[in-house]
């Protein structure tokens, strides 16, 4: 049997841009993607800490070192610039893998720069 498990999360990142008229997606600074092991075009779930909205979309790369978290297209209706978000990826794992798996958690500062990377739970 396969279980769908949390792989990684970007914890309490700040939305820096919302563009309703872009095709769609979520732009994420490449430094954050690398830190979390996330990939461009990967499906993500987003949880808006500020207003409680929960939704999904996919990743596109934003400029490395920019601190960018941009919500595009319909996702731009779910958050405003300045909102705090949790961005998660999930993946299938065997029973054996899931028994010992520890998701990666990336904590950031106020400018969306990596502050700490740890395995969950700490």
Curated annotation (Swiss-Prot):
MF terms (GO), sorted A to Z: aspartate 1-decarboxylase activity
Predominant place of localization: cytoplasm
Family as reported in the entry's similarity comment: Belongs to the PanD family.
Biological-process GO terms, alphabetical: alanine biosynthetic process; pantothenate biosynthetic process
Post-translational modification: Is synthesized initially as an inactive proenzyme, which is activated by self-cleavage at a specific serine bond to produce a beta-subunit with a hydroxyl group at its C-terminus and an alpha-subunit with a pyruvoyl group at its N-terminus.
Species this protein is from: Bordetella avium (strain 197N)
Presence of keyword Chloroplast: no
GO cellular component assignments: cytosol
Residues at the active site: 25, 58
Swiss-Prot/TrEMBL cofactor(s): pyruvate
Quaternary organization: Heterooctamer of four alpha and four beta subunits.
Classification via InterPro entries: Asp_de-COase-like_dom_sf, Asp_decarbox
Residue ranges crossing the lipid bilayer per the database entry: none
Reactions accelerated catalytically: L-aspartate + H(+) = beta-alanine + CO2
Taxonomic superkingdom: Bacteria
Protein name: Aspartate 1-decarboxylase
Annotated pathway: Cofactor biosynthesis; (R)-pantothenate biosynthesis; beta-alanine from L-aspartate: step 1/1
């Amino acid at each position: 049997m396969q279980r769908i498990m949390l792989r990684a999360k970007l914890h309490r990142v700040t939305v820096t841009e919302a563009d309703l008229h872009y095709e769609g997606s979520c732009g994420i600074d490449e430094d954050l993607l690398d830190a979390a092991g996330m990939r461009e075009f990967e499906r993500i779930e987003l949880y808006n800490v500020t207003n409680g909205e929960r939704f999904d979309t996919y990743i596109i790369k934003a400029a490395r070192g920019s601190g960018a978290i941009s919500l595009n297209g319909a996702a731009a209706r779910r958050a405003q610039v300045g909102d705090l978000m949790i961005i998660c990826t999930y993946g299938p794992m065997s029973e054996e893998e899931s028994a010992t798996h520890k998701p990666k958690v990336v904590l950031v500062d106020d400018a969306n720069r990596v502050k700490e990377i740890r395995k969950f739970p700490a």
